[in-house]
Structures are given as C-alpha cells and as structure tokens.
Amino acid sequence: MKLKYILLLSCVFAQLWAVGEAGAIFLLIAPGAGPQGAGEAQVAKADDAYASYYNPAGLGFLKGTEVAGMHVNWLPNLASDLYYEFITYRHHIDGLGSLGGHIIYLNLGEQIGMDEFGNPTDNWKSYMGAIAGSFGTHLSETSAIGFNFKVFHQKLSDQV
C-alpha cells in the first residue's frame, strides 16, 4: 500500500519538472501596425485584410478586395539578417462571403555550425513560414462565422 502512495505522489509531482518547449513560436508575432499599437486587441475590430489572421468571421462583413503587407527587421540589435514578412489578401464574393489568406515568413538568418568540440562546421540559413486560407460569411446582420486553415514549416537546421 505504501508503494502505491509513493508511485501516485511521484506521478503527481513528475509534471513539475517536465520540460516545456514551444514550436512555431513565430505565429505569435502580431502582424499589422494597428493591432500592435492596440496591444493586439484586433479581434473585435476585424475590418480589413488582417481579419484573416485575427478573426476570420470578420471577413463575412467586408466587401471588395484588399491586400496588405508588413516587413519588420526583427530584433535589429541582435542580428542584421533577422526579418519578418507578412502579406494578406481578401476578396468578397457576392452571395457567398469573403475568401482570404495570409503568408508569414520569419528569416532567422545564418546560423554558425559548431561540433561538440567547438570547431566550426558548415553554416546554414534558418527560417519559419506559414500559409493560411480563410473564409468568412455573415449569418445575420450582427453575427458571422469564419474558418481558418494554416500550414506551417520550420527549417532550423540542415541536419535531420
């Protein structure tokens, strides 16, 4: 019986020392000067092409066609070859709703390879990217529904 309690307590406290790692962290970089200036509070104000990123349901209320983009030298004091690109597009189709999408690219620059003894090896370039498709349509004067589909890829090393 004592062994059961020890095992149970071990399982409970094992999570306290678990290592957590985040993947595709570049998806948390907020695109657009307006949303960044508002502390990323863009979900309720989905009135432009950035709605495909923040709130695809907002596309349902938009008419016309729009393209928007953003380029940022990411962490310029750390390295000169880090940059973030974002481009988005939306197009309204009468009687259906609005289609949209965006492309995100974060260049992490050139990485310097080292072996376990500190000797230089081959250098390589790292990057992260994502592409998303969006659709939004209004259900009534005050409500809409939207969907987002996103695929991302990271190349952090030349080694598998």
Regions found by a protein language model. Give the residues of each.
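Sec-dependent N-terminal signal peptides
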Residues: 3-14
